[in-house]
Amino acid sequence: MNEVRPAAAGAPRGADAQPRAPLSLGLFMPNCSNAYSISTYKPEPDDWTYEANARIAHAAEAAGFDFLFPVAKWKGYGGKTDYLGTSLETMTWAGALLATTARIQVFSTVHVPIFHPLVAAKMGATLDHIGKGRWGLNVVSGWSEREFGMMGIEVLPHGERYARTAAYVEIVKGLWTCEPGTFEHESKWYRIHGGWVMPQPTRKPAIGRTAARSSATRSTSRRTTTSPSTISAST
């Protein structure tokens, strides 16, 4: 799964042009209530359930889709529909779908303030083994005071939270590739000494990046292209 960008002005064309990566087609999954519509009209009231998600995942795989992408929510928006108020946590959700599919790639979405990067790296490596290399990670910085407030987590200013996300991605990637027990990281947000994740992934999992980002995450996004794929995602 690779990001396809339009050719820059003056870029070589025709026989001299570099081949472009094929476009991959994925599906946003309804792992949250009212996922596809905020409307009160719901043809399928239990659209968020695992059974519904498994059925859609199998249909998507049979139809040739390349990946499945979930939304991470911890609290809904209230009102008559309580939009996204009921949801399946995406690490657990991905494990179940990876175990029952054969080809399609399955992502998990992780909020940086909620999952420690070492924990995310360990869970991700486990999911990679369950799916035999088909798992991917979507890292989001998080902004919702509604959600984080109920956990006592402070929402950082925009630039700072994206700088923290850059450190987060570097930690996860480092834990997946370094010699066990040798990973070291110290920053404003994290201190990791003798970091250890075993088993490591069978390959470098795809890491999703945020579409709206600071210079820190732009730099990290460039570095994450060393993994098989980098995609753009919403914050």
Q: What would you call each of these model-derived segments?
A:
Residues 66, 103, 181-182:
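A general structural signal for well-ordered secondary-structure junctions
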Residues 41, 109-111:
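Short strand-loop junctions, especially beta-strand C-caps/beta-turns
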Residues 64, 102, 131-133:
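Active-site-proximal glycine-rich helix-loop-beta segment
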